[in-house]
């Protein structure tokens, strides 16, 4: 079940097509056939239909082939209705049986649905193919969904566990069990994948440097564990040979914070031998296949066939490459954080395990002793493990064993040696695996404590039932018994909770108890002992064997219900245990050996003492192993060897596993478990095949069928009321009346109508529950009902159709009758003559009517044509308007598009600004943290430097002392040598003692380890208790409100109780007085009447008191009006108080009886007592009546009085607390004030100066802000003007388009070209912005690189200094060593000094290594930044190339646009506006430059102040001679200087910020100017190109015209010459005319011929001219063909000349003709006209040329202006650079001054050290601090200079942030105003509180006085009572003096109350509630 990927639709592997399932035909078929399941050998179960019942047997017909069979009724299992086909939760099946479960799983598996729920289980069947249901899209599909909302999936289980953990704060667990190859490990990986994706910390947090590192490591832990713990078996190519429990810890927010892995039962025997066609662990094959040659030579690796432990050689895994897997394993280890040394050490151990197998022994000839003939393999093994070869060989062949108290060498046999080697190999690999798990846990544990919650994932083998099972199978089956018990118990609990929620009555059965007998059989410790306890017990006995163990087990557990003995002697099994999954036969071969796991302790000791640290770490607990020396001998019994063990030195495998399992179960019980049961479908690893018997066995073993059994005991089928009513209401048609009815009532009526047995159902609050099978029965009845309804419906439909067909036939019959009647009438009339006339005349009547209709149609057609013409006109008008509207719409759309682009650009700018701001803030935070780290590091180095200097001084003093003592010690050397010999002997004795102590120490360490493990368990228990406490706190939080109410009532009851206690004490005192009066009444019986009258008088007084109290009540009513709401609750509390009073009175009666017993002395006293009791009873009645009346009257007053006192006391306590806080704050402030008083004096002056400067700078900043805001406002106005002009221009263009039809086309073309140009310009601007951003980023990276280089240089200097110090110390150390070596043999003190020096040297070397590491880190950072810089350079080159391409494209578009003059005019207007904006920006730049100059001046001022401070520092240094006197002054000046430096730093930062702002503005202006300049250059270039093009065209035209003119001149000259010649000839002809008249006829003939030739010539001439014009036109269209066209023109001109020569020749021949002269004259006039036309054209072109020249001059003027502006900007830039150069010079000067100061300081230190060495040693720390401050100041100055240099680069960013800062400033002002208002309000509240405190104090003092009075009175009364009691005890006479002093005054709130002694103490208790009542 690897990662499922593919292109298929994942939903078909998750969701079921319900349309197929709810097919009515299938439902009807199931109902009709009564389908059931019968057993089948081949298919497990087959579907069949019941045909006939014959007693206990039933005849059935198989559904597949129709065969009939007889089956027992008990073997038949019901089939579920088709609606339950492929159900997602098998608990919903109404027929819960094995056949239905198997059928459902089979159907889903064949449909590709591998996950199915079964109640709490999720059953998974291995598909043996890739399914596309594990992608991240599927994870997102299940994320946040509940279990019932999505189909079954391992992701749904994971999501449910994760959500329950977050919501309920309860730990979760996911338990994956199943056979090997069922997919446990893959599902575990999918769970981890899902949790790592859902709970990843890389989506928002920044806890670690690498986001998502923990999740990545968590996912990479599996490949490592699989390589070392998985192997290929017959069933599974990647079988986990161990169990694991993965705990993933989460914090309170749900993010993963760590993980932990626990492993169980590694199959270590696979490392030494494997079954046929199986492999050992993957890592051996991966190492041998994937290791390189160098690694193979280091690990001494060979071929696969050269290792004995690889039993089957190399067996490849289909579809996998071990070489690739090895690389993946190594990569996973690197990701997990394994070091190279750790990986190499692990691989060495793996290679050593293989080498163990190649060690061979042979048996000696005459003895059984083993020998090693070849030790080559042993040498390789010892080389890999770091052991001595000889010692290893000796330990294997002749180990040293203990016999009694002595050790002897015992020879081993070949079998014993082979066994020892295999045991060592297995133990080595097991320890390596344990170390690997521990190392992975260490990498995954990111917290110092466990997370808030965790999800545990258990991947462990399921039940294993082989033919014969061993000790490992017992452990696995024992584990599964415990897990199944946990499941049964959990399922029982959940069912119980469900039934409780729904209010269902059910007698619950805890099915978890069913498995307890089997578990007790295995784990019970005693009475009788279980299997594991007996096994451990046998391991302790010397001669125990496996056979004795089996005998004891049978003896102890033979009668157990779950234990069986083998039935026959020939059975191979030793005993059987009946597990819940079935009976399992166990063979007890070598169980004692496996339980003890013995090793050769000699070799283990060697491994523990290995020179390889890793191997020694693996074998550190060597004392816990069971040694082979404890095995006394190998007996010949069938069960193995006997053992002799140490006492208490080891713990067996069974004990360890039982403890780990107990711990695991405790963890699981404290979690909410989720169960995943993995099923293997077949053993052939074939997809799509399912073996039913195999699946049934696994379902039985996995507990799925057990869960079904538990479900059947209850009500497994449950359905909500609405669904039940909707589905089954058809069965009870009249049970529910019409109208609305509650769902529960409706279901109850339906159940009553269905007459179901009450035991078959339960009705809950929202659902109705049914026993298994009830819903199937209802489904059958529903199907029968539906069948009846359908049959009735079909009958009705058929009747309706028959009636409809009958009506149709009736209608057809009546129609036939009509047709027959008409045909008969026609047959009668067809021969009648009149009928014939009628048939002929009738059509003629119709013709006349048609003419009239045609005329009407013509008229109608004319009307329609008129309407059509009218409509067409309107349509044309509408189309014209529509066209106009479309044009307007296009205009508006273009405007809207422009606005949208502007908005998008602004939004993009805002986003970039925000991102830039965020980036700058992050950079600032990083830099600040880096600075703090460097400062801390520098401080640490300085401290270390001081310590080293002090240490060096100490060493120098020690060396001086040792030099003096060395001579003395030389004399004592001889005696010391003798002492040394004695000491050496003592050392030997001490070493023996030390070895003993080491052993004892190891024992103690073992005990400590055990205590630590117990402590860990206790911590786990405490954590579980804390979980339970958290869960209870959730419940407590719900009850807090009720608790508060109860607390209030309890407080009120306590108040009433206290009152009643006071009253009780009063009554007790009264009783005491009365009892004291009993003896007195013997003598004073006559005076009782007077006493009674006195009591009556006191009653009168009480009434007076009552009246006074009523007055006080009326006075207090105003104060307690607001407490009237609590009156009713007070009544209730009073009733409770009265009840308590009655209880107390009963207690009082009990006390009275005790007193009576004490007083019962004589019979006379008894009689007197009875009489006195009667009298006392009467007095008591009277007193109780008075008390009741009194209480009834003053009870309300007491309560109100008490509440008022409580409020006052609360106010008093609040005032006290407030006062105490104020006093604490006052004291703290006073101490701070005292500490700061001395500093304030120094700071006030500096503060005033800095405040003045700050105000000045604030004013400058405000001016700059104002200027910036003014510039923004102007920019906005210009933008608005530009938009208005753009709109006007668009309107003009639209008018031109309407006016000129031809211009529309050109305007549209221009608009399209313009949009293209805008796009191109926007692209160019975007590229420009990107270039600027990249350049700024490059500059920033360069700055960071420079800063890092500077830091690196500083670190390098510090490192060099430290190296110098180290060298000096090393040289001193060498000298010290030489001196110490001379006296090494004599003095132990010198050895101690040597050790100290060595430690110091090691510390220094370690520090040096740390510095080297830091240097390497900086170097790596530098390289990384250099790579990033190179990448950015490449990107910049790419962007430049793109920009150049875009510029080329822009030039092409500019050439196309150059033909439109209107567009050029528009550009000219825009250019003018841009020039205006540029001038405004220039003015802004000048103002910002002035502000920059002012800031620089302020900086120079600060530098002057800094120089002054340095001068002061020099004065302080010069006055350092009087160090002792001026220390206090130096400290003051130091603090003042620090304050000044801090203030200067802040001022400098403010200046830097302002300078940054101005620099950014300047950069922004420069960028704008550059952009404008580039725009101007482009415009000028385009105009130049246009002018050059026009100039070329004009020159070409002029040349052509000149050539034509030259031709005309030639023709004119020839014509004149011919004219003259013709005139001469004319004269000759006139003279000879007479002679020529004769030949005229012939001449005329010749003339006609010549005329014909002349026409031909003229036609040829015209064609030549036409071709010449075409050539001219072609030459204008294409410049590239100019030369060829000119050649053609020349050729045509030559042809024209030849034709003209022929024409002239013809003219010469027609001399005599006048017509020829006329024709030539007319030709000349035509040529003159052509000449004049061309001259006019030339003049026009010259005018255009002059106009273009004037435009060119204007452009040149503008270009010169732009050049001047650029020159001014360059001058400003040069000025800024010169200023920066000045600041650099100033910095260098400051550095020189700093160096001079350092030099002076060093000179002063030397002088002072020479003069005052003692004083210097005391003040070195302070001087060092001053040095650090000076260095820090120099660094800060350098940093300030760097920041000044950077201001030019950062100015642009600050200028962009000005607007945000101004907005923030407004917000800060509002917050400050709110804070001021809040401060005023708090002040008022403080004043009011102080007034209330004063008032409370006054009232408190008043109450205190009253309380003191009451206390004194109470004490007086107590004294009187005590005296009376003493007298009563003595039996003396009692004088009633209390009768006269029974009253006193109690003043409260101005009211005077006279209270009797009876009420005094109760009143006192009311006044002071905290004082307990006085009672005896």
UniProtKB/Swiss-Prot annotation:
> Where are the disulfide bridges?
none
CDD domains in the cross-refs: MYSc_Myh10
Renumbered to this chain, the Basic and acidic residues biased-composition regions fall at 1129-1147, 1698-1708
For region Disordered, the annotated ranges are 1127-1147, 1697-1728, 1872-1976
The GO biological-process annotations, alphabetized, read as: actin filament-based movement; actomyosin structure organization; adult heart development; aorta development; axon guidance; cardiac muscle cell proliferation; cardiac myofibril assembly; cardiac septum development
Key word Heme present: no
Residue(s) carrying Phosphothreonine: 1960
Domain named IQ: which ranges? Answer: 786-815
Which tissue types show expression of this protein? Isoform 1 is expressed in cerebellum and spinal chord. Isoform 2 is expressed in cerebrum and retina. Isoform 3 is expressed in the cerebrum and to a much lower extent in cerebellum.
Q: What is known of its domains?
A: The rodlike tail sequence is highly repetitive, showing cycles of a 28-residue repeat pattern composed of 4 heptapeptides, characteristic for alpha-helical coiled coils.
Disease linkage in the record?
Associated with severe intellectual disability, microcephaly, and feeding difficulties as well as cerebral atrophy.
Under which name does UniProt file this protein? Myosin-10
Name its species.
Homo sapiens (Human)
Phylogenetic classification of the source organism: Eukaryota, Metazoa, Chordata, Craniata, Vertebrata
Gene name, Swiss-Prot/TrEMBL = MYH10
């Amino acid at each position: 079940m690897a990662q499922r990927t593919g292109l298929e639709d994942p939903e078909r592997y998750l969701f079921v097509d319900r349309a197929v399932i709810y097919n009515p035909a299938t439902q009807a078929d199931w109902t009709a056939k009564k389908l059931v399941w019968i057993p089948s050998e081949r298919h497990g179960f087959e579907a069949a239909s019941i045909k006939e019942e014959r007693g206990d047997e039933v005849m059935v017909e198989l559904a597949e082939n129709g065969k009939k069979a007889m089956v027992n009724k008990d073997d038949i299992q019901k089939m579920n209705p088709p609606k339950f086909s492929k159900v997602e939760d098998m608990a919903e099946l109404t027929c819960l049986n094995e056949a239905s479960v198997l059928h459902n799983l089979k159907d889903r598996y064949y449909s590709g649905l591998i996950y199915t729920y079964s109640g709490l289980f999720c059953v998974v069947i291995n598909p043996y193919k890739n399914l596309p249901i594990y992608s991240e899209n599927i994870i997102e599909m299940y994320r946040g969904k509940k279990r019932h909302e999505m189909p079954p999936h391992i992701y749904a289980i994971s999501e449910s566990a994760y959500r329950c953990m977050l919501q309920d704060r309860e730990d979760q667990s996911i338990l994956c069990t199943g056979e090997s190859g069922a997919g446990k490990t893959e599902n575990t990986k999918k769970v981890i994948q899902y949790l790592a994706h859902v709970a990843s910390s890389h989506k928002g947090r920044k806890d670690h440097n690498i986001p998502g590192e923990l999740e990545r490591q968590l996912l990479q832990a599996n490949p490592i564990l699989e390589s070392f713990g998985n192997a290929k078996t017959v069933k599974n190519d990647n079988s986990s040979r161990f169990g694991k429990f993965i705990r993933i810890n989460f914090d309170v927010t749900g993010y993963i914070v760590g993980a932990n892995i626990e492993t169980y039962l590694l199959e270590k025997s696979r490392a030494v031998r494997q079954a046929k066609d199986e492999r050992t662990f993957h890592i051996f094959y991966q190492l041998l296949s994937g290791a390189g040659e160098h690694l193979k030579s280091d690990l001494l690796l060979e071929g696969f066939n050269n290792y004995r432990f690889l039993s089957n050689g190399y067996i490849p895994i289909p579809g996998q490459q071990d070489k690739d897997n090895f690389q993946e394993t190594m990569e996973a280890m690197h990701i997990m954080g394994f070091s190279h040394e750790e990986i190499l050490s692990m691989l060495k151990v793996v290679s050593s395990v293989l080498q163990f197998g190649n060690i061979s022994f042979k048996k000696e000839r005459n003895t059984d002793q083993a020998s090693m003939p070849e030790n080559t393999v042993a040498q390789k093994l010892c080389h890999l493990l770091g052991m001595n070869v000889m010692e290893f060989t000796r330990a294997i062949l002749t180990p040293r064993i203990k016999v009694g108290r002595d050790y002897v060498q015992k020879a081993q046999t070949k079998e014993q040696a082979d066994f020892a080697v295999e045991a060592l190999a297995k133990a080595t690999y097991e320890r390596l695996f344990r170390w690997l798990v521990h190392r992975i846990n260490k990498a995954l544990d990111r917290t110092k404590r466990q997370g808030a919650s965790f999800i545990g994932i258990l991947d462990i083998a399921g039940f294993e039932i082989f033919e014969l099972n061993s000790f490992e199978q017992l452990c696995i089956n024992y584990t599964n018994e415990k897990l199944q018990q946990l499941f049964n118990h959990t399922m029982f609990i959940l069912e119980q909770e469900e039934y409780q929620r729904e209010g269902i009555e059910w007698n619950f059965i805890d099915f978890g108890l069913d498995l307890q007998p089997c578990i007790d059989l295995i784990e019970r410790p005693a009475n009788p002992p279980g299997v594991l306890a007996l096994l451990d017990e046998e391991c302790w006995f010397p001669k125990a064997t496996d056979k004795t163990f089996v005998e004891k087990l049978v003896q102890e557990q033979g009668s157990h219900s779950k234990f069986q003995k083998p039935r026959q002697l020939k059975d191979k099994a030793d005993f059987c245990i009946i597990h819940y999954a079935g009976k399992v036969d166990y063979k007890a071969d070598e169980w004692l050996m496996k339980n003890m796991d013995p090793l050769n302790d000699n070799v283990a000791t060697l491994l523990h003492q290995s020179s390889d640290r890793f191997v020694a770490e693996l074998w550190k607990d060597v004392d816990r192993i069971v040694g082979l020396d404890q095995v006394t001998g190998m007996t010949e019994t069938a069960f193995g060897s006997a053992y002799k063990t140490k006492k208490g030195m080891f713990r067996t495998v069974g004990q360890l596993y039982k403890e780990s399992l107990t711990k695991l179960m405790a963890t699981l019980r404290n979690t909410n478990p989720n169960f995943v049961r993995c099923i293997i479908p077949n053993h052939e690893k074939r997809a799509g095949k399912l073996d039913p018997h195999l699946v049934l066995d696994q379902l039985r073993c996995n507990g799925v069928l057990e869960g079904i059994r538990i479900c059947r005991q209850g009500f497994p089928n449950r359905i909500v009321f609405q669904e039940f009513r909707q589905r089954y209401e058809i069965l009870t048609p009249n049970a529910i009346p019409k109208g609305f009815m509650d769902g529960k009532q409706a279901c109850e009526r339906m159940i009553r109508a269905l007459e179901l047995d009450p035991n078959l159902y339960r009705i809950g609050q929202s659902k109705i529950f049914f026993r298994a099978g009830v819903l199937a029965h209802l489904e059958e009845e529903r199907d029968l009902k539906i069948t009846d309804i359908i049959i009735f419906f079909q009958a009705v439909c058929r009747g309706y159709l028959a009636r409809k067909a009958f009506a149709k036939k009736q209608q057809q019959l009546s129609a036939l009758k009509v047709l027959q009647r008409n045909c008969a009438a026609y047959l009668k009339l067809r021969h009648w003559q009149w009928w014939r006339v009628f048939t002929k005349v009738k059509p003629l009547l119709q013709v006349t009517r048609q003419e009239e209709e045609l005329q009407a149609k013509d008229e109608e057609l004319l009307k329609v044509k008129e309407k059509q013409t009218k409509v067409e006109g309107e349509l044309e008008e509408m189309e014209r308007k529509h066209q106009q509207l479309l044009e307007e719409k296009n205009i508006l759309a273009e405007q809207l598009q422009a606005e949208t682009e502007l908005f998008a650009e602004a939004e993009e700018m805002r986003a970039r600004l925000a991102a830039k701001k965020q980036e700058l803030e992050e950079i600032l935070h990083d830099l600040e943290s880096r600075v703090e780290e460097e400062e801390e590091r520098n401080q640490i180095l300085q401290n270390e430097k001081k310590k080293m200097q002090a240490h060096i001084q100490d060493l120098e003093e020690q060396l001086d002392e040792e030099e003096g003592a060395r001579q003395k010690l030389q004399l004592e050397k001889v005696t010391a040598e003798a002492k040394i010999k004695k000491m050496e002997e003592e050392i030997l004795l001490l070493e023996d003692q030390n070895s003993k102590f080491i052993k004892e120490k190891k024992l103690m360490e073992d005990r400590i380890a055990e205590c630590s493990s117990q402590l860990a368990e206790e911590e786990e228990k405490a954590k579980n208790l804390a979980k339970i406490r958290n869960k209870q706190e959730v419940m407590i939080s719900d009850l807090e409100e009720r608790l508060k109410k109860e607390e209030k009532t309890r407080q009120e009851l306590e108040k009433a109780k206290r009152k009643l206690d006071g009253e009780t004490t009063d009554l007790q005192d009264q009783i005491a007085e009365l009892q004291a009066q009993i003896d007195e009444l013997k003598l004073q019986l006559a005076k009782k009447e007077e006493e009674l009258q006195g009591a009556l008088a006191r009653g009168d007084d009480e009434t007076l008191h009552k009246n006074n109290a009523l007055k006080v009540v009326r006075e207090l009513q105003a104060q307690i009006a607001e407490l009237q709401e609590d009156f009713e609750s007070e009544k209730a509390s009073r009733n409770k108080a009265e009840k308590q009073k009655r209880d107390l009175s009963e207690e009082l009666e009990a006390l009275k009886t005790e007193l009576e017993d004490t007083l019962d002395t004589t019979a006379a006293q008894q009689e007197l007592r009875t009489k006195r009791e009667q009298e006392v009873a009467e007095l008591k009645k009277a007193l109780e009546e008075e008390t009741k009346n009194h209480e009834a009257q003053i009870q309300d007053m007491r309560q109100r009085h008490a509440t008022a006192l409580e409020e006052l006391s609360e106010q008093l306590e609040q005032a006290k607390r407030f006062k105490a806080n104020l006093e604490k704050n006052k004291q703290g402030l006073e101490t701070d004030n005292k500490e700061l008083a001395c500093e304030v004096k120094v700071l006030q002056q500096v503060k005033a100066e800095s405040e003045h400067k700050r105000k000045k700078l604030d004013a400058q900043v405000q001016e700059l802000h104002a200027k910036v805001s003014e510039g923004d406002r102007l920019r906005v106005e210009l933008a608005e003007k530009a938009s208005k002009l753009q709109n006007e221009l668009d309107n003009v263009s639209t008018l031109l388009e309407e006016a000129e039809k031809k211009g529309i086309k050109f305007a549209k073309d221009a608009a399209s070209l313009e949009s293209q140009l805008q796009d191109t310009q926007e692209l160019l601007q975007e590229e420009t912005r990107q270039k600027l951003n990249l350049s700024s980023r490059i500059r920033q990276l360069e700055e960071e690189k420079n800063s890092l280089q500077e830091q690196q240089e500083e670190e390098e200097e510090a490192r060099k200094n430290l190296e110098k110090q180290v060298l000096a110390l090393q040289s001193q150390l060498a000298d010290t060593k030489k001196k110490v070596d001379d006296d090494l043999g004599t003095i132990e003190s010198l050895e101690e000094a040597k050790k100290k020096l060595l430690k110091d040297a090691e510390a220094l070397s370690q520090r040096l290594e740390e510095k080297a590491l830091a240097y390497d880190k900086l170097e790596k950072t530098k390289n990384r930044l250099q790579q990033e810089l190179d990448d950015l350079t490449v990107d910049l080159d790419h962007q430049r190339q793109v920009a150049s391409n875009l510029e080329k494209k822009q030039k092409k578009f500019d050439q196309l646009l150059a033909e439109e003059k209107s567009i050029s005019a528009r550009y000219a207007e825009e250019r003018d506006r841009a020039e205006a904006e540029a001038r405004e920006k220039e003015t802004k730049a000048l103002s910002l430059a002035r502000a920059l100059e002012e800031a620089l001046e302020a900086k120079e001022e600060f530098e002057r102040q800094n120089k002054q401070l340095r001068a002061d520092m020099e004065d302080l240094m010069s006055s350092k001679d009087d160090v002792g006197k001026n220390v206090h002054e130096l400290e003051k000046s130091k603090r003042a200087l620090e304050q000044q430096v801090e203030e200067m730093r802040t001022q400098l930062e403010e200046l830097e910020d302002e300078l940054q702002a101005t620099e950014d503005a300047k950069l922004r202006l420069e960028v704008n100017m550059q952009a404008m300049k580039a725009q101007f250059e482009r415009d000028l270039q385009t105009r130049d190109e246009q002018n050059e093009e026009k100039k070329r065209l004009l020159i070409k035209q002029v040349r052509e015209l000149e050539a034509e003119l030259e031709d005309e001149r030639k023709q004119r000259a020839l014509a004149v010459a011919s004219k003259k010649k013709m005139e001469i000839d004319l004269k000759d002809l006139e003279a000879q005319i007479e002679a020529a008249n004769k030949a005229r006829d012939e001449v005329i003939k010749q003339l006609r011929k010549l005329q014909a030739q002349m026409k031909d010539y003229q036609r040829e001439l015209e064609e030549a001219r036409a071709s010449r014009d075409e050539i001219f036109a072609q030459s204008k269209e294409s410049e590239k063909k100019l030369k060829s066209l000119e050649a053609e023109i020349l050729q045509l001109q030559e042809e024209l000349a030849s034709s003209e020569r022929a024409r002239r020749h013809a003219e010469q021949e027609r001399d005599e003709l006048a017509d020829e002269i006329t024709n030539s004259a007319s030709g000349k006039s035509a040529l003159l006209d052509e000449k004049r036309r061309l001259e006019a054209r030339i003049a026009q072109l010259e005018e255009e040329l002059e106009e273009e020249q004037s435009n060119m001059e204007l452009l040149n003027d503008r270009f010169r202006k732009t050049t001047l502006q650029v020159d001014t900007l360059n001058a400003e830039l040069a000025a800024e650079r010169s200023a920066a150069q000045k600041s650099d010079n100033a910095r260098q000067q400051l550095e020189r001054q700093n160096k001079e100061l350092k030099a002076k300081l060093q000179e002063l230190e030397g002088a002072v050290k020479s003069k005052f060495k003692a004083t210097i040693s005391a003040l070195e720390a302070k001087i060092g601090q001053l040095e650090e401050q000076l260095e820090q100041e120099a660094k800060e100055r350098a940093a300030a200079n760097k920041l000044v240099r950077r201001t030019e680069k950062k100015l642009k960013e600050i200028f962009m942030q000005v607007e945000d800062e101004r907005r923030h400033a407004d917000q800060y002002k509002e917050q400050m105003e709110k804070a001021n208002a809040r401060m005023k309000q708090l002040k008022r509240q403080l004043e009011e509180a102080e007034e209330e405190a004063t008032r409370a104090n006054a009232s408190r003092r008043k109450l205190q006085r009253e309380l003191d009075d009451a206390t004194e009175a109470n004490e007086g009364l107590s004294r009187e009572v005590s005296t009376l009691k003493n007298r009563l005890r003595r039996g003396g006479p009692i004088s009633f003096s209390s009768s006269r002093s029974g009253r006193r005054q109690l003043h409260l709130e101005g009211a005077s109350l006279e209270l009797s002694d009876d009420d005094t103490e109760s009143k006192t208790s009311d006044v002071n509630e905290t004082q307990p009542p006085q009672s005896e």
